[in-house]
Amino acid sequence: MKTVATIFLFCLAFCIANTAASAGSGGDIKAMDSVRSKFEAFNKHDADAIEKIYASGATLHSPDYPNLAGNKQIADTYRGLFDAIPDAKDNLETLDSSASHVYAQFVLTGHLKGAQDKPISVRIISVYTVKDGHIVDDSTYYDRKVP
């Protein structure tokens, strides 16, 4: 009887732990969906959609834009990028999350406007903080010297 009770308690503990883990990963899925939507909007060059994905008080930190603040300013920066690289595309390689943070590794490809014979390829990693389905912080890292 003691063995049956021990097995029952073990199974109960496992079920409770598994339920808690599943509930915690639901936030990860929602956060990852928000970031996936940002990449889909980027590849469509849809700056209006990008503006809606970022929270109104969002911040973006990157080598070229160390302190962008607000979803409108962030979207305007993407509009400028789409103008400078008309065929810009983000090729997502890795997407992972932990709580409200999403980690993305991707490669930006395209050609600078007027230089169709010179392709660019930039490896990038971004750390996004997502709250209530919106990106509130974007810390992006890349080598500015890569052609």
Give, region by region, the residue ranges found by the protein language model.
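Bacterial N-terminal signal peptides
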Residues: 7-17
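Acidic-and-aromatic substrate-binding clefts and catalytic sites of carbohydrate-active enzymes
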Residues: 67-68
